[in-house]
From Swiss-Prot:
<keyword id="KW-0488">Methylation</keyword>
<dbReference type="GO" id="GO:0005737">
    <property type="term" value="C:cytoplasm"/>
</dbReference>
<keyword id="KW-0648">Protein biosynthesis</keyword>
<feature type="modified residue" description="N5-methylglutamine">
    <location>
        <position position="254"/>
    </location>
</feature>
<dbReference type="InterPro" id="IPR004374">
    <property type="entry name" value="PrfB"/>
</dbReference>
<dbReference type="Pfam" id="PF00472">
    <property type="entry name" value="RF-1"/>
</dbReference>
<dbReference type="InterPro" id="IPR005139">
    <property type="entry name" value="PCRF"/>
</dbReference>
<comment type="similarity">
    <text>Belongs to the prokaryotic/mitochondrial release factor family.</text>
</comment>
<dbReference type="Pfam" id="PF03462">
    <property type="entry name" value="PCRF"/>
</dbReference>
<dbReference type="InterPro" id="IPR045853">
    <property type="entry name" value="Pep_chain_release_fac_I_sf"/>
</dbReference>
<keyword id="KW-0963">Cytoplasm</keyword>
<protein>
    <recommendedName>
        <fullName>Peptide chain release factor 2</fullName>
    </recommendedName>
</protein>
<comment type="function">
    <text>Peptide chain release factor 2 directs the termination of translation in response to the peptide chain termination codons UGA and UAA.</text>
</comment>
<dbReference type="InterPro" id="IPR000352">
    <property type="entry name" value="Pep_chain_release_fac_I"/>
</dbReference>
<dbReference type="GO" id="GO:0016149">
    <property type="term" value="F:translation release factor activity, codon specific"/>
</dbReference>
Length: 367
């Protein structure tokens, strides 16, 4: 076996073990491990199920603790096993064992990288589910088609990440695409992964809707906000609400268009508007819309506390059309994030949901 190859593998293993130790320190492994035992014991007590809300909170906390503790244990165990195998391969000059070690290093690197990525989730709401609102800008069919492309991009991204998605409401475009849509995303750190997508997305392309194939520029806004659980108190005065019902405009079969099951709620003091049409039951749609409103009002208050430069005035204009975050220039095969200057040339991959590098760059820079 070549000494250079052995040294490279040994260095990789030492580096990964050191990163694993740093993660245990940074993520408070000992404290989280003790807390996991405590929560597990609490859930084993039959009396806890007398309070369904408390049991649900404990179950959620247990899953979050297990995610960290079990992954840290896996990293330590795999690191130790690979070190032992490497020492054996080196001592016995065993090429097959050494090749197996090299193959498994990739798995260890992926586990370490995934936990290191978590260190960038600094927002206390990052572990929560979230909502993605997409709104077409001015420009008619071209802008609406672009909004539809963004909706598809985020659905594909969520599929890649293993997130669960639910289309809360969708307004179809007049010719193609959509005028707007709201998607609920559930999964570990859904909000953390998606929150930096908030802003204006700009598309430049030769329009398929222009008979002269001229270059068109279109804009769509994306707004991501976290779902707020019941432990956070958001007081909503019923007198401040205007509740409208209407017939759903999106796809949903014959039944959905025969009844006024869709619900739109306007919070008069702030101008925040939410709507839901994903269920045939008006009652369920209203409950979901109230949950969305609570999340929006929480995000509004959070931004006020953080003294950000702009208040959220309503559900569509809260971002400001000048706040462009990413430019998609398709005929030049270039997509560039204007905040981080990260750029790629494979435009189709991005539109198919390959957003990891853009999201990682924005989280690293804290945008």
């Amino acid at each position: 076996m070549e000494a250079e190859r052995l040294n490279a593998i040994a260095q990789q293993l030492d580096d990964l073990r050191a990163r694993g130790r740093e993660l245990r320190r940074y993520l408070d492994y000992d404290e989280k491990s003790s807390k996991l035992e405590e929560v597990t014991r609490a859930l084993e007590d039959p009396a806890v199920w007398n309070n369904a809300e408390k049991a649900q909170e404990l179950g959620k906390e247990k899953r979050q603790l297990e995610d960290v503790v079990h992954n840290l244990r896996d990293i330590e165990s795999l690191s130790s096993d690979l070190k032992d195998l490497f020492d054996l391969a080196e001592a016995e000059d065993d090429e097959d064992t050494l090749a197996a070690v090299e193959a498994d290093i990739g798995e260890l690197q992926a586990k370490v990288h995934a936990l290191e990525f978590r260190r960038m989730f600094s927002n206390p709401m990052d572990p929560n589910p979230c909502f993605i609102e997409i709104q077409a800008g001015a420009g008619g069919t071209e802008a609406q088609d672009w909004a539809g492309m963004l909706e598809r991009m985020y659905l594909r991204y969520c599929e890649r990440k293993g997130f669960n998605v639910e289309l809360m409401e969708e307004s179809e475009g007049e010719v193609a695409g959509i005028k707007g849509a709201t998607i609920k995303v559930s999964g570990d750190y859904a909000y953390g992964f998606l929150r930096t997508e908030t802003g204006i997305h700009r598309l430049v392309r030769k329009s398929p809707f222009d008979s002269n194939a001229r270059r068109h520029t279109s804009f769509s806004s994306v707004f991501v906000y976290p779902e707020v659980d019941d432990s956070i108190q958001i007081d909503i005065n019923p007198a401040d609400l205007r509740i409208d019902t209407y017939r759903a405009s999106g796809a949903g079969g014959q039944h959905i268009n025969k009844t006024d099951s869709a619900v739109r709620i306007t919070h008069e003091p702030t101008g925040v508007v939410v709507q839901c049409q994903n269920d045939r039951s008006q009652h369920k749609n209203k409950a979901e819309a109230m949950s969305m409103l609570k999340a929006r009002l929480y995000e509004l208050e959070l931004r006020k506390r953080q003294s950000e430069q702009q208040k959220l005035e309503d559900s569509k204009s809260d971002i400001g059309w000048g706040h462009q975050i990413r430019s998609y220039v398709l005929d030049q095969s270039r997509i560039k994030d204007l905040r981080t200057n990260f750029e790629v040339g494979n435009t189709q991959a991005v539109l198919d949901g390959d957003l990891d590098d853009f999201i990682a760059a924005s989280l690293k820079q804290g945008v």
